[in-house]
Amino acid sequence: MARTAPAASFESLESDLDQKFAYPASSKTYIPGSRPDIRVPMRTILQTSTRTEKGEMPNPPIPVYDTSGPYSDPDVHIDLKAGLPALREKWIAERGDTEVLPGLSSEYGRDRANDPATAHLRFAQLTNPRRAKAGANVSQMHYARKGIITPEMEYVALRESLNLQALYDKPEYKALLRQHPGNALGAGLPLRPEDITPEFVRNEIATGRAIIPANINHTELEPMAIGRNFRVKINGNLGNSAVTSSLAEEVEKMVWSIRWGADTIMDLSTGKHIHETREWILRNSPVPIGTVPIYQALDKTGGIAEDLTWEMFRDTLIEQAEQGVDYFTIHAGVLLRYVPLTADRVTGIVSRGGSIMAKWCLAHHKENFLYTHFDEICEIMKAYDVSFSLGDGLRPGCIADSNDDAQFGELRTLGELTAKAWKHDVQVMIEGPGHVPLQRIQANMDEELKHCYEAPFYTLGPLVTDIAPGYDHITSGIGAANIGWMGTAMLCYVTPKEHLGLPDKEDVREGIITYKIAAHAADLAKGWPGAQLRDNALSKARFEFRWEDQFNLGLDPERARSYHDATLPAEGAKIAHFCSMCGPKFCSMKITQEVRDYAASLPKEAQQGMEEKSIEFLKKGSKIYS
């Protein structure tokens, strides 16, 4: 349902866009915090009862992590032109270390605000931005290192635990909460839901093992954490280009992405109206928004990398920080001396940001200005609490180029920059590859942990083979599940259109679901507390032929239902004890249930006799022939 309407049609966005949505058989619930304005959302999936000979046995509701914000709350009115409620406004103001500016600090921002040519695109409900008071640092890391537990940290603790500790004493959840031991591969995961406390979150932020990307100007944000010792998160990309996609479509894609489970969104726009597109997305986004500021800076030069300047880039950082961008991808590790190391690669430099900075370095024969001005960038970041996503500008673009000197040289420089950012108490995550065959993935995680001091790793896949254009959501999902288990904190999704074109809504959905699978598989492998609850509930529903519950407990209920109904569309098939794969006579689960029923119906004496024969068999050494 991609739209190609011009940006000028944005006036009709509110009527065009399906803003509200409801998940099937679900309710929006909130976990209360220590103060009335801390209400942490989660989704509860309702189940039908199990039919037995003794009557119906109820099945308990299943709580799941929710990224959809107010869009799935039937009690909240969504007005895209007004933006979402300013959830964090009071928290930020009462800390007393910020000030509301009299106007925009960015020259470009002021120009756009006063340009009559963009008046019809402008978000009308803008307020003046905030900035740290002189000498103040407003980053979550700074507060954490001072021993302060912020409302954002408490919010994250409640969100990560889902209040599961309350379920462990309830008999109806006992079987559902069974979980295989995980292997956290050295990570310090909480062992039980009750261990996920605000103090646990504060400590993870203070050490740099996790970040809470939360710009003080993105007050609509529902705080979340990215870190090795939390749930594995996923990022979804959107953004217009010079050849396709309208402003309204990007807002629609944002809402669509969080519906399917994107934990953060990166706006990678390179086409028209980048500033206005970003404003509308931010004001209506409950999840953190990241950008690559060099893209917009390049747009300001007319696309000529050689004309980039530090002054122009600095103005772009301030412009975006005052809009509320939560994390910046900064390609400060692409050093002049690393560029020649890519000469013998099969695919050279595939990162857009990396290639821009490499071209600038070669054109001027100077060191990367993002590297030389890094301390000044840190000063901007801590004034707005923007997190670094230190870009892997020299990531491999094919498996042949994986783990080479250029890639790992840059990674070591990112570790150096991480230490420098932490001296400013600025939050950092590290971007990673890319294209890496399975047997070389572990080395990427090991190198990141070693050289970047356990700062959260944020990887694009990696793709484990290069032979499947059109299916790279699968080739990358395989790598993502593996590296997520090994310790990567956030996985950047890949869609089926990767390497082929700009994704549309269905591509976005496909990519997000693929990566939700990868992230959940990683959580199971690590042993995240309660991760297996949803699996157990769905497996029980499957065995009991509760088809509606199977659909609703899945990551994509619509897809599951449509596949089932393609061959068995009748409503009666929703209670049938078979599907079209095996039919009514060959369903293994149906046969197993019949065996159980038969065993249960045997006289007590017959059951006792079989037990005696079993004991006799075991005493003889379990030998069939003697």
Curated annotation (Swiss-Prot):
Signal peptide: none annotated. GO terms for molecular function: 4 iron, 4 sulfur cluster binding; carbon-carbon lyase activity; zinc ion binding. Its EC number is 4.1.99.17. [4Fe-4S] cluster binds at C579, C582, C587. It catalyses: 5-amino-1-(5-phospho-beta-D-ribosyl)imidazole + S-adenosyl-L-methionine = 4-amino-2-methyl-5-(phosphooxymethyl)pyrimidine + CO + 5'-deoxyadenosine + formate + L-methionine + 3 H(+). Substrate binds at N237, M266, Y295, H331, S351, R352, G353, D392, G393, L394, R395, E431, Y458. InterPro entries: ThiC (IPR037509), ThiC-associated_dom (IPR025747), ThiC/Bza_core_dom (IPR038521), ThiC/BzaA/B (IPR002817). Belongs to the ThiC family. PANTHER family: PHOSPHOMETHYLPYRIMIDINE SYNTHASE, CHLOROPLASTIC, THIAMINE BIOSYNTHESIS PROTEIN THIC. This is Phosphomethylpyrimidine synthase. The lineage of its organism: Bacteria, Pseudomonadati, Pseudomonadota, Betaproteobacteria, Burkholderiales. The gene is thiC.
